[in-house]
Amino acid sequence: MEQGVWQEIELLYQKFQKLGISEAVDYDKYYLYSLITHSTAIEGSTLTELDTQLLFDEGVTAKGKPLVHHLMNEDLKQAYELAKVESDSLVPITPAFLKRMNAMLMRTTGSVHSVMGGSFDSSKGEFRLCGVTAGVGGHSYMNYLKVPAKVDELCAILQEKQKKMGTFREQYELSFNAHLNLVTIHPWVDGNGRTARLLMNYIQFCYHLFPTKIFKEDREEYILSLRQCQDEETNQPFLSFMAGQLKKSLSLEIERFKVSQKKVFSFMFLSII
């Protein structure tokens, strides 16, 4: 079954490239806006793709929507722009790199936390010094004392694997596994999901792959796949979910392009009777 899905994805990818969809003016910019909108929406932002476009291009805020939702989107945009630049130089994934990315996306919404383990600033990408759980009665993440060593280990694994991943599927699945493992370690008090999705896309940028979007309407399935992996200590549910998201992303982009090409232009003039 998995092999069949990846064959479909490769065919869609070839079609996407053949149609020259990403060559359209500002395509990358607006697709990035969509990535950002869906990533923050998974964390509770109420901004739509149109809201985000107006915010980024015109500086216009969405009436009646919380300021923090605008700040989340602005900060994540800066983090993605940094990731795009760093991917051009294939900057290695290190703990310092991950802290920089988290600091960028938590720049205006993070704060200083004083806990039993000490004080840390979540706006500067500092690792948590306290325990965290996934909501009331939810999954408890690893002890904060173990976080630095586990992040070091993850970065070493990713650096080594990036040199060896040769096939289309291997490259994508490396990015998906990076996402899963970082969010499972949960190094920060906030912004773990956004940073994990950014890391996934960063690896895809490094390989010049189409960046995978996780759709806000699939949030529940996304969270369930992560929990299943964490409970059963297997990556398969998440890899299957992400393959589905990639297929969905490519299919929608191709369909939108085809619809736009079929539209017939008609002159529009006001008729005065």
Regions found by a protein language model. Name each.
Residues 1-190, 194-273:
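FIC/Doc superfamily catalytic core
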